[in-house]
C-alpha cells in the first residue's frame, strides 16, 4: 500500500487519475481518502489525485499524542512532488481537510498553483476549538467530555434546548459520543490537527502575496460552517473565486462533482 513516511508517522494515500498535474486532496473529519473518488472521472485526464488519509483516519499510521505540524506538511509536499516529478502542485480539501490545505499553503506557498476548498474549516479561528485543544483547562474538560458520554449527551441536550448550540452541532455530538471508536478517534484527531490554525488575515496575505488561485465552495444550508465565513474570507482577494451551492455541510456528491471540477479545469 502507498504511504508517505513523515517522521515517525505514515500517511496512507489513494491514487486517482493519471493526468500530468498533481492534486493533493484532504478529506473531512471521520471520513477516508475514498470520499474523493466522485471527482476522478472529471479530473483524471488533467490531474493525478493523491487523496491523503489524515492522521487517525483510514489506513494512516500516526503516533498517539503527536501533532501534525507545518514542517510535516512541507515534507509531504516535497515527497509528493518528487514522486510525481513536478515542481508545483494543487490542493483540494473538504471541511477540516480544507484547514490542512490552508496550513499547507502557508508552509509552502511557492509550491502551490490552485487551491479548491469545500465547506472549508480554517477560514476563521473557532474559539471553542482553540480552548479545548490549546489550553490546559480546555484539554481537561475535553477529556472529561469524552470519558463520561452519558452525562455529556445530557449536557448537549440541555444546551440545544437553551439554543446555545445548533441542532447540527447536537447531532454531530450525538454521533461521536455514542461509540467507543468514534470517541477515541476524536480524542486523538482533534488535538493532532490543532497546530494547523492560523489567523485569517495572515492566510489572506499569503494568498495575495503569491497570487494563489483560490476556489472556495460553501453550502447555503451549512449550519456548521456557514457561507458568510467564505464571503468574509474572500472579500478583496483578487485571486479568489467564491461560490455558494444549494447544499448543507455535505457540499459535494456524484451529482455535482462535475460542476465543481470544471473550475479546476479552466
Labelled PLM ranges:
Residues 210, 216-218, 222:
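Short beta-strand/loop motif that positions the catalytic acidic residue
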Residues 245-259:
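Catalytic histidine-centered segment of alpha/beta-hydrolase-like enzymes
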Residues 106, 115-145:
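Flexible "cap/lid" loop of the alpha/beta hydrolase fold
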Residues 9, 15-59:
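Conserved HGGG/HGGXW glycine-rich cap/lid loop of the alpha/beta-hydrolase fold
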Residues 202-204, 212, 226-235:
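Short alpha-helix in the alpha/beta-hydrolase fold that links the catalytic acid
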Residues 221-225, 250-251:
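Acidic catalytic loop of the alpha/beta-hydrolase fold
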Residues 51-94:
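Active-site loop/oxyanion-hole signature of alpha/beta-hydrolase fold enzymes
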Amino acid at each position: 500500500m502507498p504511504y508517505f513516511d513523515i517522521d515517525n508517522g505514515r500517511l496512507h494515500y489513494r491514487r486517482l487519475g493519471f493526468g500530468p498535474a498533481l492534486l493533493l486532496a484532504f478529506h473531512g473529519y471521520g471520513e477516508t481518502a475514498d470520499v474523493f473518488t466522485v471527482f476522478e472521472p472529471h479530473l483524471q485526464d488533467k490531474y493525478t489525485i493523491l487523496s491523503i488519509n489524515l492522521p487517525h483516519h483510514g489506513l494512516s499510521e500516526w503516533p498517539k499524542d503527536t501533532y501534525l505540524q507545518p514542517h510535516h506538511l512541507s515534507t509531504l509536499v516535497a515527497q509528493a512532488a518528487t514522486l510525481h516529478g513536478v515542481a508545483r502542485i494543487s490542493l483540494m480539501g473538504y471541511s477540516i481537510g480544507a484547514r490542512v490545505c490552508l496550513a499547507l499553503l502557508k508552509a509552502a506557498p511557492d509550491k502551490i498553483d490552485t487551491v479548491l476548498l469545500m465547506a472549508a474549516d480554517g477560514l476563521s479561528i473557532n474559539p471553542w476549538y482553540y480552548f479545548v485543544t490549546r489550553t490546559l483547562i480546555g484539554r481537561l474538560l475535553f477529556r472529561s467530555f469524552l470519558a463520561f458520554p452519558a452525562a455529556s449527551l445530557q449536557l448537549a441536550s440541555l444546551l440545544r434546548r437553551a439554543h446555545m448550540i445548533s441542532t447540527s452541532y447536537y447531532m454531530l455530538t450525538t454521533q461521536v459520543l455514542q461509540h467507543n471508536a468514534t470517541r477515541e478517534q476524536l480524542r486523538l484527531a482533534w488535538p493532532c490537527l490543532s497546530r494547523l490554525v492560523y489567523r485569517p488575515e495572515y492566510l489572506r496575505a499569503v494568498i495575495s502575496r503569491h497570487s494563489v488561485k483560490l476556489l472556495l465552495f460553501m453550502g447555503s444550508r451549512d449550519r456548521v460552517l456557514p457561507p458568510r465565513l467564505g464571503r468574509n474570507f474572500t472579500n478583496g482577494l483578487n485571486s479568489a473565486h467564491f461560490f455558494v451551492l444549494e447544499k448543507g455541510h455535505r457540499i459535494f456528491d456524484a451529482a455535482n462533482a462535475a460542476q465543481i471540477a470544471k473550475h479546476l479545469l479552466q
